[in-house]
Amino acid sequence: EIVLAMDYIVRSGMALYWGTSEWSAQELEEAHKVCREWKCVEPIVEQPQYNMLKRERVEKEYLPIYDKYGMGLTVWSPLNAGILTGKYNKGIPKGSRLDLFKDNGGLKGNIDEAGGLNEKTLEKVRKLTKISDDLGVKTAQVALAWVLKNEHVSSAILGVSKIEQLRENIETLKVKSKLTDDVMKEINSIFE
């Protein structure tokens, strides 16, 4: 049903392409199989959560999908609800997202699923902050640049609450070149 509906939408000119969100590799395989059998428009993008703390699906499960179907990724939560910005390294600041939405089960669930806000996670982020400081950039910029260095990531969905955060996020495009192979190895050794 989904394949037929999306095929109709694209062929009718209501959309140029279609994609999926949080589908498993098996579901993507099935969708492409149906599309090819029925000569329907295939999905071109998947929207998974992806960040330094949540990597398994993007880096392992989807590996056969990228080349086989030419799919890209539009990832969400590249900063894992702000944890990868470094702002929680010394506790939860007053007025921060985790302070304001501490009773939000969905937000808490996403954080817990990616390792949680605990000392082990915070120690990793503190090490990332040290790398960022050595590069002369913000921790959030390094975390975003790391996501964008993945050749399968077409774009990252960002959420900001302040204009300065948006500016810093845009500046990430200049930071990406600072993540040399050696820096990437150092980061990956922290978050493996």
At which residue positions do the language-model features occur?
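Beta/alpha (TIM)-barrel catalytic core signal, keyed to glycine-rich beta->alpha loops juxtaposed to Asp/Glu
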Residues: 1-192
